[in-house]
């Protein structure tokens, strides 16, 4: 096979993403799909939601915001902390044939682990080792790993991108677990040189204020939003909230908006020359505690913070406001001192044209606005799909659609019989965008049977239908006219070979219920 054809086939293969349901994962999934990258996701079902529902709710939110129908990833139901990530042999076979790289993003932000049989060790260290073993099992050598800038632990000064183990201490088990996981990734003998992303503290969306988790900066914002409104305003409308903070207020904090982090990682992931490097994804302009306080002052019309720096405060006279505030931020007290400086040479080389949004007063107010609307994570989520699954009946393969059929067919291939007239041989890909869509590879060898497997064809010359599922269902009659406007890799004169077989097959396999 020529280098050109190898490269072409590589572009048609899938990227396996872990952690797609987390904050950064939601944005990585969006940006990869918008970039036209074929994505498979490893997702764990919950007691209340199937894996398809979990991913569907994320994509429905993006579609409402972007006002565009997105492609659907191939969804693999599994568990990161289980052997082979909880995947079946058939799923592993599919990855072996269809996946070219892994973007391991999943992690748990737990600061204290009771023992190594619990979090954060189970996911951050054990889960990463399971992903490495899965790469060996499937023959994937291109691993992209989302670490954290804080594998540097308690180090000060300039932190080099290629530095890791210099005998540093750590503030908590989260930092140590991510350090150990990155060590495993770097030492893995069956990978090419891994690409490692080390984001700083991740905050919400710079444009909308959205977040799905309230850690880091949001812990402080939520606490302020809870405590300050309890204090009655004086005759001038000002709330006096006396509190002494053991800092100067000018200590730099490396905080980065999640949408920028995802945009940068997507750029680096798709830049061949960036492979094998380590990247500190940290801000152009650090945030300071004084800025956060002043921005919150202006939002809540309050005042009262005193910066004590290294001067010990007299704790005999502590206001109720101060006592409650300090008690609630104890887990982050180890971060009161200045952040180190993260070397960004590699980052600037490959993505220096993507500036990091500065967290200014307007953006911090946007974060506060979103937190208030979201009731700081307590608002009931209403993510009803545009097209309810009860309105659609499909025999195209889905992980939870027919467990017995999948057990007998090995998940990767399902045979569909049609009661219509015999079909001529054909091979197509279905890329059905929008609510409850998906990606499939359909092959008919003649007669009344066709084989369907998840994922798009890996051959560049196989025609692929790109269309929203709702549009396909609502316009069957229109689709009997020339279909080339909906297809990739198909010329108008080719329509007659598979137009009617396709529509005939879809009428049998995908219909609206009455």
Language-model features and meaning:
Residues 1-101, 105-108:
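N-terminal Rossmann/SDR dinucleotide-binding element
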Residues 101-108, 112-118, 122, 126-176, ...:
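Conserved Rossmann-fold NAD(P)-dependent oxidoreductase catalytic core, especially the SDR/UDP-sugar
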Residues 157-158, 187-196, 200-253, 258-263, ...:
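NAD(P)-dependent short-chain dehydrogenase/reductase
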Residues 227-235, 240-245, 312-355:
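A hydrophobic C-terminal alpha-helical subdomain
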Residues 264-331, 371-385, 432-435:
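Mid/C-terminal beta-alpha module of Rossmann-like enzyme folds, strongest
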Residues 377-514:
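Feature captures hydrophobic
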């Amino acid at each position: 096979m020529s280098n050109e054809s190898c490269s072409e086939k590589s572009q048609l293969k899938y990227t396996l993403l872990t952690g797609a349901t987390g904050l950064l994962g939601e944005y990585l999934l969006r940006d990869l799909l918008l970039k036209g990258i074929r994505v498979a996701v490893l997702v764990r079902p919950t007691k209340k939601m199937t894996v398809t529902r979990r991913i569907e709710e994320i994509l429905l939110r993006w579609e409402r915001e972007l006002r565009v129908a997105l492609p659907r990833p191939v969804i693999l139901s599994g568990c990161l902390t289980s052997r082979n990530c909880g995947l079946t042999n058939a799923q592993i076979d599919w990855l072996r044939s269809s996946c070219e790289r892994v973007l391991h993003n999943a992690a748990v932000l737990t600061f204290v682990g009771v023992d190594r049989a619990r979090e954060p060790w189970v996911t951050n260290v054990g889960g990463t080792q399971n992903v490495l073993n899965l790469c060996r099992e499937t023959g994937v050598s291109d691993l992209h790993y989302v670490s954290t800038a804080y594998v540097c632990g308690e180090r000060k000064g300039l932190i080099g991108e290629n530095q890791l183990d210099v005998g540093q201490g750590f503030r908590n088990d989260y930092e140590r677990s991510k350090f150990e996981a990155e060590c495993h990734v770097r030492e893995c003998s069956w990978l090419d040189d891994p690409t490692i992303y080390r984001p700083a503290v991740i905050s919400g969306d710079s444009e909308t204020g959205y977040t799905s988790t309230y850690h880091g900066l949001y812990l402080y914002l939520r606490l302020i939003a809870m405590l300050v409104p309890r204090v009655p305003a004086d005759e001038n409308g000002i709330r006096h909230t006396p509190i002494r903070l053991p800092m100067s207020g000018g200590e730099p904090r490396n905080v980065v908006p999640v949408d920028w982090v995802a945009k940068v990682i997507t750029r680096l992931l798709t830049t061949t020359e960036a492979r094998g490097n380590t990247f500190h994804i940290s801000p152009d302009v650090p945030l300071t505690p004084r800025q956060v306080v002043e921005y919150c002052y202006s939002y809540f019309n309050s005042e009262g913070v005193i910066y004590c720096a290294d001067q010990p405060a007299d704790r005999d006279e502590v206001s109720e406001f101060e006592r409650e505030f300090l008690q609630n931020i104890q887990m982050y007290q180890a971060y009161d001192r200045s952040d180190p400086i993260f070397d960004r040479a590699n980052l600037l080389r490959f993505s220096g044209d993507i500036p990091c949004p500065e967290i200014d007063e307007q953006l911090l107010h946007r974060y506060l606005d979103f937190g208030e609307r979201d009731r700081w994570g307590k608002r009931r989520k209403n993510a009803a799909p545009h097209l309810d699954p009860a309105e659609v009946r499909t025999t195209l393969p889905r992980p939870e659609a027919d467990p017995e059929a999948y057990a007998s067919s090995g998940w990767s291939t399902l045979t569909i019989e049609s009661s219509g007239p015999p079909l001529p041989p054909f091979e197509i890909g279905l890329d059905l965008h929008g609510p409850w869509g998906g990606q499939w590879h359909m092959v008919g060898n003649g007669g009344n049977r066709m084989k369907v497997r998840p994922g798009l064809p890996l051959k560049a010359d196989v025609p692929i239908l790109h269309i929203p599922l709702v549009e396909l269902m609502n316009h069957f009659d229109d689709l009997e006219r020339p279909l080339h406007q909906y297809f990739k890799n198909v010329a108008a004169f080719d329509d007659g070979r598979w137009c009617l077989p396709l529509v005939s097959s879809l009428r049998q396999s995908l219909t609206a219920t009455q």
